[in-house]
Swiss-Prot record:
This is Adenosylhomocysteinase. One of its GO terms (molecular function) is adenosylhomocysteinase activity. GO terms for cellular component: cytosol. Pathway: Amino-acid biosynthesis; L-homocysteine biosynthesis; L-homocysteine from S-adenosyl-L-homocysteine: step 1/1. It catalyses: S-adenosyl-L-homocysteine + H2O = L-homocysteine + adenosine. May play a key role in the regulation of the intracellular concentration of adenosylhomocysteine. The keyword GTP-binding does not apply. Transmembrane segments: none annotated. Pfam families: AdoHcyase (PF05221), AdoHcyase_NAD (PF00670). Its cofactor is NAD(+).
Amino acid sequence: MTESKGFLRLAWARDHMPVIAEIRKRFQAEKPFKGIKVAMALHVEAKTGIFALLLKEGGAEVKMASCNPLSSDDSVVQSLKEDYGMPVFARKGETSEEYYEYLHRTLDVQPDIIIDDGGDLTKIVHTERKDLAKNILGGNEETTTGVQRLRAMERSGVLLFPMFDVNDANMKHLFDNRYGTGQSTLDGIMNATNLLIAGRTVVVAGYGYCGRGIAMRLKGMGANVIVTEIDPIKANEAIMDGFQVRRMNNAIRDADMVITATGMKDVVKYEDALVAKKNIVLANAGHFNNEVAVSEIEKRSLEVNEVREFVKRYRLENGNTVDIIADGRLVNLAAGQGHPVEIMDLSFALQALTAEYLVKNHDKLERKVYPVPADIDRYVAEIRLKQFGGELDQLNEEQIKYLNSWDEGT
């Protein structure tokens, strides 16, 4: 029997996720999620599939939808359904109506735990499906955008159950956001455009860990990088890392390409597009499709044409043309395969262990946003370091004494 494309993609991911493999051994033996129902809204592709199967192997009943209309891998969706019997509600190219319908169908499992990416699943529970909240022990949030929404809910006093901020764990944002986003964003752009990076002037909007990862990879491939920022501290970092820092409306005039990574809407406005170079490429690495003002650009364009599989060209009122990849949605998944497998191995290991912690400790938690416990963060780091063949020095007793003293000087 010939295995399907999706089955093979899942198998490939499984073979390259060694931290998950280590956790799987214990989960299969201990079944920490026995009797637990999990609703997930994540990018439905191979790495996510392995994470969902890990929870299932740990005893959970899992239902999954996509957290983005364009990010699903249909071959993986099919394999999860047919080969593994997992209820998955997703397809690449969902309409807005389908997207929200699938989130609701996932919540029909009446979850004990929700695992979200971007915050849409959490929002629905807090608005249209509040009846479910009383049975939810808590949940995890994967990404910066979703954490921002959770923090706003917490400040407003409307959060109905504890949520864990997986994004800000060290083994997530230092690796996933920087190395994962840096590589996968350029992979998506190059797949969509087949254009050369070397010699191009590229504006990177935002110099958080995602932005600096993108800028680092662009620099390594020979691009001339300009950074835009609203934070003077991050702007100084960008300058000392060797990049120019300018305002968007100024920088875009010299740019061949703009990549947004901010979590903020309208970073590239219609007015910016008017003064951009002809056929400038606009791509977004953030979660939502509003960092580039695609709706306004489309509404005010004289003509829109699909010029490549993932690229639309907009002719503006002044005759200028701009090329937008994947309707301004996150380019690494809409036009690529997402983060490297080994990066998501770390992120999903954190997710799995934090979900286990939630099951064991939910009765001690309040309606707050919590960090991933430090011992979980360190445990994942230690497993991966060992797999890399790395070794750590150990402090001796004299060094520990020195570390805890105050009276020993020069």
